Amino acid sequence: ALPISQAKLDGYNKLCKCGQDYDMIVISGGDGTLSEAVKAMMTFDKKIPLGYIPAGSTNDCAQSLSIPKKMLDAAREIVDGVYFDYDVGKFNGQYFVYVAGFGAFTDVSYETSQTLKNKFGHAAYVAEGIKRLSKITGQQMRVEHDGEVIEGSFILGLISNTISVGGMKKLIASGVCFDDGLFEVVLVKTPKNAIELSNTINEAVLNKLNDKHFVTFKTSKVTFTSVNEVPWTLDGESGGKHTYVEIENCKQAIRFKLKPNDITAEQTAVQCSAGDMIMTEDGHPVVIEDQSEIED
């Protein structure tokens, strides 16, 4: 068992030091805690299973992976779970779990008072975001992916592997797959006036991401170039200011242990067909670590 983290990067440093001594790692905390753990585990020489018990204000990744909010239920699902290899992002050499972003509201998570987050939870993020509506400005960007070049001014950019960002589940286009090696990218064009801003926000809330106000695509690698330094956010934490950013998808880089469900079903079937997993008589999937364990 690892001690409780006392400060930022405390969990990261402890896992880097001794994480590979364990057969499995289980953490409890918010998205920031999960991000620290994954960053540390991406430095490991071997893939060690990760169990996650959400205990933060928003818990975007837990929502995406259908991990229960109740801690005891989440712990039970880890015990009874199957392995699921999840894509991780790489941002100019840094790792992130579920989202990299720039522009409007992306700094709300780390700019919102921790006291308010502890007291009001997700509502604290919403209140902070509303205060920023009148200060929204666009960033001139050159975006390149898969041989395509997109140039324009954008108030928001999200490169994600999640169905929930800041607790909002409708901003990301449908069809998210957590292990396909692809990001979902959403770029929100800079509105020309207050009316267009209002229309853009309404369309985002309703998940009507039309070509007039949005650019959406899937990709395994994308670059962003800007004249001015642009602040970026990684998993709700500051990712620094950059004029050039390269983001790559590290396909199936982290192994979660999750309850068998629609998310894990396809990967479980592939593992069974490859002989990496068998099904018990009651239909429960079991991972085979040593092929000699299987009797002829």
Indicate where each model-derived feature is located.
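ATP/nucleoside-binding phosphotransfer catalytic cores, i.e., glycine-rich phosphate-binding loops
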Residues: H145, E151, C177, L187-D296
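Short acidic/glycine-rich loop or secondary-structure boundary segments that cap or lie
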Residues: T106-V108, E151-S153, V165-M168, N193-E196
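A generic structural signal for short beta-strands and their flanking turns/coil linkers
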Residues: T137-Q139, S153-I155, D179-E184, K218-S220
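ATP/NTP phosphate-donor binding region
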Residues: A1-S28, S35, K39-A40, D73, ...
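Gly/Ser/Thr-rich active-site loops/lids in small-molecule metabolic enzymes
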Residues: L116-A123, V165, A173-I195
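Glycine-rich phosphate/pyrophosphate-binding beta-alpha loops
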Residues: G101, F105, L158-S174, S238
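Short amphipathic alpha-helical segments
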Residues: V38-M41, Q63-L65, K170-L171, N199
